[in-house]
Each structure stands twice: as structure tokens, then as C-alpha cells.
Amino acid sequence: MKKICLLLFCLFAILPLSARDYETVPGDMMQTRIYTLENGLKVYLSVNNEKPRIQTYIAVRTGSKNDPAETTGLAHYLEHLMFKGTKQFGTNNAEAEAPLLAEIELRYEAYRRLTDPEARRQAYHEIDSVSQLAAKYFIPNEYDKLMAAIGAEGTNAYTSNDVTCYTEDIPSNEIENWAKIQSDRFQNMVIRGFHTELEAVYEEYNIGLSSDMRKLYATTCKMLYPNHPYGLQTTIGTQEHLKNPSITNIKNYFSKWYRPNNVAICMAGDLDPDKTIAIIEKYFGSWTPGADVKQPTFAPLPPLTAPKDTTIVGQEAEQIWVAWRAKQANSLQADTLQLMENVLSNGRAGLFDLNLNQTMKVQRAAGGSELLHDHGGFFLMGTPKQGQTLEEVRGLMLAEIDKLKKGDFPDNLLPSIINNMKRSHYSLLESNRGRAGMFVGAFIDEVDWKQEVESIDRISKITKQELVAFANQFFTDGYVSIFKKQGIDSLQKKIDKPVITPIQANRDQKSAFVQAIQDAKVEPILPHFVDLKKDLAILKTKKDLPLYYVKNKENGLFNLVFYYDFGQCADNRYDIAADYIKYLGTDKMTAADFRQKFYELACDWSVNVGSENITVSLSGLHENMPQALALLEDLLQHAKADKEAYNQMVELILKGRDDAKKSQGTYFSYLYAYAIAGERNSYRDVMSEQALKEADPQLFTNLLKGLANYAHQVIYYGPMEEKEIARLIDLTHVSAKQLAAVPENKPYLEIPATDNEVLIAPYDAKNIYMRMYHNEGRTWNPEEAAIQEVFNEYFGGGMNGIVFQEMREARGLAYNAYAYYYHPSRKDRKEFVMTHIITQNDKMADCITHFNEILNEMPVSETAFQIAKEAVVKRLASARTTKMGIFYAYLNALRMGLDTSLNELIYQHLDKVRLQDIVDFEKQMMANKAYRYIILGDEKNLDMKALEKIGPVKRLTTEEVFGW
């Protein structure tokens, strides 16, 4: 009896580790396990063994909704501060540091209550001085060093209304080290490096000032949810609050919401669930739960019974948004909203797609829902054509809503939507990020996992009559409209940069915690690189077309690509042809018929024209591939030119070109292309307005039909066997018996930077976009590939790089800053160096000075080098090239003149790379070189004298940059 009792005791003693209770849902294709620890921590696990990596999200059910009203933006800048370390890492002496951090906190509480400008300047100077003392004990970026040491990728975080989420993609052999780091981070966070990080957040705020989409979203929320935090405050916060922060409020917020019973760990990838949950319990099980993490409740929203309009102003293209209020994310109304969204705007065959976009009645129109924890909304978004008013766009969109309410859409649209939803779900399962992202959404919005898993099944049972009835109840006159006009927003305020003394990088220092993680022994992951001779089959069709084949053994999806080795730089008319065919049909089928049929088959097609290649692609459900391919071939060969459709398309193209000038990010892309290649570059090399208007539309249908006459390759990834796909290509794909050589590419060649010069173009904003570019015409040397890879990790790569540390961490000069040494895309092209920064106008000269300092005298650290090198080793060892990536690795190797993949080449030489190699490489390639400074900004707000000292300043007009 005693033996039996002892046996039972031993059995139950090990149950928590090997057979812990968990929830599952029948029919869940991800086979998710959901655990709940005793302290309330939720853990979602899904196994996907495709590669030895795991996507991890740690999601906290709190966001800007819970920001204190007097310090909005708090949740977001707490997210930033979570990267600064704990008592164990990020510091070389936590005890000595603590009283200084406490003093900084008290000084900020006093500072935020001051209103006199001179008193504030003096108080900030004192904060800066104390911060200098505290910085002696601060080891910046130790969290990033830890992530680099374990081979993590995608180190980041995001904050929204209801969520703050921390992301890492880790090798599967580093779960324990990852858990050890994260448990300390989430339980023992220390706020340090505060004033420089807050300045980086303010730079992020500046970037948002130029985004009219942010304004539209914030204004829409304000009208939909006028007495709820969704409408009363934004995630980034107000300018005033960002400049008057409270460390005390941050600590209180962290203490309340960052508790295990308000957090979920979401993981998908190559993991053993039993071992993983045991590790998580080991490190997170003692985390103290919060006494009250219940989400706050707010007063009911006032009813919306009549239309409400408002107008905002911004530099980007005009738009209109129309929105209705909806229920929260975990209500079953979400099912009907998702179906309704797809009836209106699924990107291919919805009412907006066919009746507004296909017919070119507007520049663009779309619709969709956003469902949050407390409330939701359904949005319509429209952009006008040239000469069209926003009121007209709204009227056209509302007319489509009326069709929905009348049931004026095909009966087969609903089953087509279900097929496409299933296809999208299959695609999502291929991605660890997709799987883990679903877990985050369900946890944050308190959606039961069973409800999530069964959503497609429930939606498939909604009838057309039920949907129409719902639409009539939902789309009332209680909607809001936001008219976004084009112009300068006079409400935006300029704030001068604070005087910040750079904090020490201390990059040669290392905490005992970091050393312990580096010393931890893990079972190594052996690299497995794509074998260019074995991992894909290279066949020939009966028509002698090369066929590259990889079998999909995972699901019923396929990808088929016809690849042509010439592109826009050979003939820029193909880009227009690729757009034009979307609006055409044949003698037997209209353009709308084609869209509806492809959507019914749950297949997509596209013609993409790159600088040096053209691809015709088809993808979707395997069982429908033969019919979809026949449809595509029919359209390519028999497309019927339509003069009216062509003229309308030209109007859209010209309006789109004009709109591009109004977007800061798009404008800078054009400027950069002009700066490195001159007038003939991939952005400007397009048909002129005159050429477009004079062209015969038949020309463009002939161009695509004529692709059948040129040599090309076939790429296939899918479930078909080799002989089966070869037979289908022979039977269905149209190609000439004798294929002609493709037109000759005339590449866009970069202009060497032989002397310092400045190119500046005008854009009125509170910040500038700036790049420094160097190219001395040097051909890529494969023997240096490993050195270049480690150099980029060490110098410009991510949060642990020299650039990030010096420009953002030490000085608060930017939110976004990086630098890389780029190898060319083809072996006969040239290498180049590029630095990038987005910064407040009055920080430009500082950025230039400090960028040149680190370029000319690169900080050298053996400690930082070893971490960078190990990060590259672990990243490449755990990388796997799969699916379509196999083909592109093969094509890339051909272009680069390699007989192995580039990753394998780099890995083979990593062991020989030493710090001195990095130092020598940087001195030879980057230090004291001539640079072309490329700046987009408003001259009257910039230090032009500082620019003139660099070299000749060439002022470009907008017309010169764009070519129109």
C-alpha cells in the first residue's frame, strides 16, 4: 500500500511539468494549447516545425485607453522605457544609480508644473546634469545586447488603444534564456535614460505630424467616441504632455497594469509545449498578480442619430472618411461585420471594387471595420479624382451602401467570400507571426478562443437575407464624415530642441546578467542552407521552357510565376500595360466578370513590372489552378482595348503623380532616387503625360500579349507533382514555338560621389528626412561578404548598433536612424554606403556633425563586436529558406555569380572575422570619404550656413525631382 501511495505521489508530483492542464478547441488547425498559470498569466502555444525559430509576443492588456488624462502618451513611452533594463542589467551599479534616478523623478515632477520658459530651461538643465551623473552607471542597450546574444530578430514593441505588445523572434534553443530575460524585464523594470528616450519619442511624434492618416483616424475616433478615451486621447499623446512627463505616473501605471493576470505570452514555432510551459512557469510563476486589473468602465456613448461632418487640413492628398459606430471586438456582431466588409470591399470583387475602383468613378475607395476592446467602428475611405469633390466621393460610397441594403449583389458572392477567408487562413498558418498575432488579438479583446476558431464556420451560415437585414439596421443616418482638405495645418506648433549633454555609451561595460546569458550553454542549432542543386528541381516543358519546381507538402495552396528577365529600364511602357489590363475584359467576359470569377476561385493574379524583371503571377487554391490559369491566359491573349477606360486610367495616373508630391515619405523616395542616379532613375523613368495621352491603348494589350514571344522561366510551388504541372503548362500556357531574346535592360546606374555636395528639395514640415550617400564605383567582392554582414550588425544594425546608440540613445536626435554598407543586387554593379535619419529641423546640424564623427572615427569595442558577430552566427544558423524563398535564393545566386546561397557564403567565412577586420573595412570604405547629402525640408527652418560649409548646395525644385 505504501508503495502504491508513493507511486501516486511521484506521478502527481510531476504532472505540473509534463501534463499541465491546458485548453484546446476541436477543429483548431493551429492545435493551440492555452495554459493559465496560478498567478493568472495566460500562455498560448502553437507548434510549427518549418524552421528552428519561435515568434514570441508578450501582450499586456493595456494601452493608451488607460493613460492618465494629464499625461497622455504614457503607455507608449513606457513601452520605450521597457528596453532600458532592470536592477540586474542596463547598469553597472544599481545601488549607486538608484538615488540619482529618484532625484531625476522628483525633478521631473517639479519641472512639469513650471510654466515660465526661463525657469523651465534652468530646471531642464539641472535634470540634464543629474542625468549625466546617473549615466555613469547606465549601460545603454543591454537589453538589445541580450537579444543579440541569443540570436533574436525583430526586437520591437508596439502600443495602441488597448494593447502594449513586445515582440521577439528567437532561435528554438534559446527559450530558457529568453524566458529568464523577459521575466526579469517584466517584473523589475527600471526607468533610466529617460530624457534622451523621451526626446526620441518626441521625434516619433514629429513624424506623425506629417501623416494625414493619423489625423483622420484621431478625428474619426473623436467623433465616434466623444466621451471615451478612444476619442479623447491618442496613443502618441499631446505635444504638451510629451514635454511635461511624469515618471511617477509611469511607475504607478506599470505597477497596476503590468501584472501576470493582465498579460499573455504568445508563442508559435518550433517548440515542445510541455517543456516550454515548464520553463515559463519556472521564470514567471512567482510573478505577483495585480489586485485590480479589471478594465475601467466609462459612461455610455451619446447616441448618433444624424450625420455629423467636420473638416481637417493636411499637406497630403484629399480624402474623406465616413464612419458608423459598432460593438466591441468580442461581440458576435464581429462575424456579420467581417462578412459585410468583404461584400463591400474585398480588394477584388466587392461592391466598391467593381462599382467604384474598377469603373474608376473615384481615385480610390475602400471600407472595413476596426473592432476594439470597448467599442468598434465601420469605416469608408475615399480619395477623389481630379476635379471631383469630397462630397461627390461620399455620395458614391453611400450609394454602394444602399445597394448592400437592397441586396443588390450576386448570390454567389457570399460563398466566394468564405472560400477566400479559408484561403487567407491557410496562408496565415504558414507564418509564426500570423499565428501568434491571432493569440494577441484574442487575449487583448477577451475573445474566447473557441469563438475565434469557429468564426469562419459561423460566418458561412449567415444568409444573404440576414446580412441585408443587418445592413439596414446598421447603416443608419447616425454616421460621421471627416473631410480631409489639402493645405497647411496652422495649428501645428514648433518646439525648440532641448539642450542635451550626450550620455556615455559605456559599450565596453557588461553586467553580470549579460555575461551569464552569454555563458549559458545551449544545444547548438546546426545551419541548413538551401542546396541550389537539390532543393529545387529544374525541369523543361515540351516547349523547352525552364520550369523550377518545389513541392508544397503543407497545404493546398500554390504559387505560379512566369519570370521575364527584362523590366522597366528596358521599356517603361510595360508598367502602364500592367495597370491597364486590370480594367479590361475580352469579347466574352467583362473586366468585372474576370474579377468575380477569380474571386470565386479564390485565386489572385498580377503583372508586376520591376526595374529589371517582369513577373506574371498566379496564386490560390490548388484545386482551382487549372481553371484560373486558363482564365489568366485568356485575358493576356485576348484583352480588348477600351479607349474610354484608358483615358480614365490616365487621369488616375496623373492625379496619383500629383498626390505623390504631397506625401513626405513618397517625396523623399523620389528625391533619393534622383540623388543617386540622376534624372534617369526608376521613379522618373515613366511615360510622360503627353506620351500617355497620345498613345493608342491597343499598344499596351499587344505588349502583354507579346510576352508569349519572349524567353522566360516558369516557377511553381504547390501540391502538384512534377509531371502534372509540366503537363498543365504545356496544355494551357501560351508561348511561341521559337522564343525571342528579351529586350535589353538599360540599368539605372548610380552616380559616384566624388566630392561633398548637398542636394535639398522643399517640403514644409517640422522635421527633415536626410541621407548621406557614398559610392566610389567599387565592385562587390564576395570574399568580404562576411565582414560586411558583421560590420552592418555592429555599426548600423538595429538597437545594438553604433548609430542607434550614438544618435538616439546618447543624444535623442532621432526616432529613426541607421547606416549600412550595401552590396549590389548583381555582381557587375557597385557597392555603396548610406546613412539615414529623420530629425527635427533644428537638430539637422547636430546630426550631420555626429554622423561624421562616428563615420570618421568609428567607436571600437571588442565587447560590442563579439555580440554582433554572435548575433549573425545564430541568425544564419537558425534561418531556413523555404517555399518561394528557394527560387529567389537561386535567382539571387545567379545574379551575384555564386554557386551557393549568399547566407551560406557569409556563414562559411564568419569564423575568420575579427574586430580589426571591421575597423579596417570601415576606415577603407567609409571614413573621411566624399558624401552626397540628400535632404528634404524647408530651407527657412534649416541652418543653411552649416550646409554650405559641407560643399556646394544644389537646390532642386519639386518638378526637377519628380520630372513632372
Residue ranges, per PLM feature:
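Sec-dependent N-terminal signal peptides
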Residues: 4-13
